Amino acid sequence: MARAGAPEVIRAAQKDEYYLGGLRSAAGEALHSLAGAKKWLEWRKEIELLSDIAYFGLTTIAGYQTLGEEYVGIIQVDPSQQRVPSRLRRAALVALHAVLPYLLDKALLPLEQELQADGDAPRASQGSLLPGGRSRSGARRWVRHHAATLTEQQRKALQRAVFILRQGFACLHRLHVAWFYIHGTFYHLAKRLAGITYLRTRRLPGEDQKARTSYGLLGLISLLHLVLSMGLRLYSFRQKQRARKEWRLHRNLSHRRSSLEDRAVCRTPLCTLCLEERRHSTATPCGHLFCWECITEWCNTKTECPLCREKFPPQKLVYLRHYR
């Protein structure tokens, strides 16, 4: 048996992804019909993980070919390429392929959201952005508690590190796929880490050196596209950081300006009748202050305080000299 080429490995992966998509969809629809849309939104990632584990548990871990591998006629072998992988190696493959990405996303996504919040919005409102109120989970509360203790410099450094990690994993995956197109050995990064390759049991019609050359050219194009997209993402990240910094500066200046205006308004006594600066302050028997012109005109129609409605004759008004 010869080593499987890139066309067989890609066809097998696409076929497995097709059946995995159907299994995930069926499991999600079952949960949606039994528990409702809210629970489905809350647990859809876990449902996808359980579907992947069930699929690979019944095939790879059990020692059978997956439906995609059976479709193209390839089998898994260990680094010696003479024996099928041990059960432990196959279990490690499934853990690296299905469980590890879920755990990384579960850890990095809440941390990135808390760091991006940066105190700009009330903490209680952040949970509304998450489906099913997942912000109440213990992991998110732990992340929120420790993120609140960070200084501004530590928060910026950690936010930059989380961004680099998330983008780095995505770029590493794309780089690995491009390298596979060129060399045609490991399509999934998990298989490279587990040391599992493929041998083909039959030769597919139409495979020749021209197809391998085409995949090599595709790999070079993918590498070029990866470099360009990495540059654009880095530029976009710097632009967002600059815009966020300018917005915080503008917000602080606006808050400071509004505070100064409020203080100035508080220092200027206002008449509650004309809503302007109080002139010739006059006191009613109940102790409220108004402009002399405003309160005398008021008393011509109503002999009561405009605020507390206490009755009093106009001659009880007291003009306050040298009082603002």
Swiss-Prot record:
Zinc finger (RING-type): 271-309
Functional summary from the UniProt entry: E3 ubiquitin-protein ligase component of a retrotranslocation channel required for peroxisome organization by mediating export of the PEX5 receptor from peroxisomes to the cytosol, thereby promoting PEX5 recycling. The retrotranslocation channel is composed of PEX2, PEX10 and PEX12; each subunit contributing transmembrane segments that coassemble into an open channel that specifically allows the passage of PEX5 through the peroxisomal membrane. PEX10 also regulates PEX5 recycling by acting as a E3 ubiquitin-protein ligase.
Binding positions (Zn(2+) 1): 271, 274, 291, 294
Subcellular location: Peroxisome membrane
Chain's gene name: Pex10
Region entry Disordered, spans: 119-139
Annotated organism of origin: Mus musculus (Mouse)
EC nos: 2.3.2.27
Keywords: Membrane, Metal-binding, Peroxisome, Peroxisome biogenesis, Protein transport, Transferase, Transmembrane, Transmembrane helix, Transport, Ubl conjugation pathway, Zinc, Zinc-finger
Gene Ontology CC terms, in alphabetical order: peroxisomal membrane; peroxisome
Transmembrane segments: 6-35, 37-58, 88-120, 146-183, 215-234
Peroxisomal matrix side stretches: 1-5, 59-87, 184-214
Positions bound to Zn(2+) 2: 286, 288, 305, 308
Enzymatic reactions: S-ubiquitinyl-[E2 ubiquitin-conjugating enzyme]-L-cysteine + [acceptor protein]-L-lysine = [E2 ubiquitin-conjugating enzyme]-L-cysteine + N(6)-ubiquitinyl-[acceptor protein]-L-lysine
GO MF assignments: ubiquitin protein ligase activity; zinc ion binding
Official protein name in the record: Peroxisome biogenesis factor 10
Topological domains, Cytoplasmic: 36, 121-145, 235-324
Control of this protein's activity: The E3 ubiquitin-protein ligase activity is stimulated by PEX12.
A Pfam family recorded for this sequence: Pex2_Pex12
Record membrane topology: Multi-pass membrane protein
GO BP field: cellular response to reactive oxygen species; protein import into peroxisome matrix, receptor recycling; protein polyubiquitination
Quaternary state and interactors: Component of the PEX2-PEX10-PEX12 retrotranslocation channel, composed of PEX2, PEX10 and PEX12. Interacts with PEX19.
Main location: membrane
Entry remark concerning the domains of this protein: The three subunits of the retrotranslocation channel (PEX2, PEX10 and PEX12) coassemble in the membrane into a channel with an open 10 Angstrom pore. The RING-type zinc-fingers that catalyze PEX5 receptor ubiquitination are positioned above the pore on the cytosolic side of the complex.
Family per record: Belongs to the pex2/pex10/pex12 family.
Bias type Low complexity, positions: 125-136
Enzyme class, broadest EC rank: transferase
Pathway: Protein modification; protein ubiquitination
Organism classification: Eukaryota, Metazoa, Chordata, Craniata, Vertebrata
